[in-house]
């Protein structure tokens, strides 16, 4: 967003003008324990735990580059410890997956029909793809993600939400009430819809 880009420029200006000792990191989409249930992955997991069909914006072909929060944290520490002052490092785990595939992976991991989800009206201006190239972080600072396979990180996340209902339960009803006011279940899009492998046709 423009505000995030603006903050990066401010940090660069402070480093150059006032000698502030700072680095900048930009990350891809996080997932993992303790993420608010309004977010895409925990919302779908907790819906399934509640016996509610997951909700997918539009055709679900929007791609996100997912990184487990533990890997994001170790990336940040690597930058703090060894990064060059004033430089920007991108933190990503090569986890590009489209949204419909994420939902199907969640359903399969939880022993459900991978097609047991609802399409809802798409978000306005829904970005098609986010991606991060973390080559610099890996080559210069020697960082590597622990969760190289998205599904293994996803399973660990599912296990956490199963075991910690007392953490997410108090915020679930209010979150779903807000979504219910804006989301409408629609038929699966015909043109550009996705098949079981997440491919468009």
Describe each model-derived feature in a short phrase.
Residues 3, 33, 37-41, 65-69:
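The catalytic Tyr-centered alpha-helix of NAD(P)H-dependent dehydrogenases
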Residues 16, 29-32, 139, 160:
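Active-site micro-motifs of SAM-dependent methyltransferase domains
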Residues 6-9, 39-40, 132:
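Short, conserved clusters of charged catalytic residues that mark active-site
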Residues 1-23, 48-50:
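Active-site Tyr-X1-5-Lys
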Residues 42, 48-201:
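C-terminal substrate-binding subdomain of Rossmann-fold SDR/epimerase-dehydratase oxidoreductases
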Residues 8, 27-34, 62-63, 82, ...:
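Active-site pre-Tyr helix/loop in NAD(P)-dependent dehydrogenases
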Residues 20-40:
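Flexible, glycine-rich beta-alpha linker
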């Amino acid at each position: 967003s423009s505000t995030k880009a603006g903050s990066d420029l401010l940090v660069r200006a402070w480093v150059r003008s006032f000698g502030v000792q700072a680095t900048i990191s930009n990350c891809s989409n996080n997932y993992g324990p303790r993420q608010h249930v309004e977010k895409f992955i925990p919302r779908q997991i907790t819906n399934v735990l509640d016996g509610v069909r997951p909700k997918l914006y539009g055709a679900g072909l929007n791609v996100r580059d997912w990184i487990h929060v533990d890997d994001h944290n170790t990336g940040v520490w690597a930058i703090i410890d060894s990064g060059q002052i004033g430089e920007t490092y991108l933190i990503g785990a090569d986890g590009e997956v489209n949204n419909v595939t994420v939902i199907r992976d969640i359903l399969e991991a939880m022993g459900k029909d991978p097609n047991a989800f609802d399409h809802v009206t798409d978000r306005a201006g829904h970005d098609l793809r986010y991606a991060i190239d973390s080559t610099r972080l890996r080559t210069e600072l020697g960082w590597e993600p622990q969760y190289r396979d998205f599904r293994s990180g996803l399973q660990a996340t599912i296990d956490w939400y199963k075991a910690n209902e007392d953490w997410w339960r108090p915020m679930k009803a209010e979150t779903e009430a807000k979504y219910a006011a804006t989301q409408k279940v629609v038929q699966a899009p015909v043109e550009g819809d996705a098949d079981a492998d997440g491919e468009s046709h």
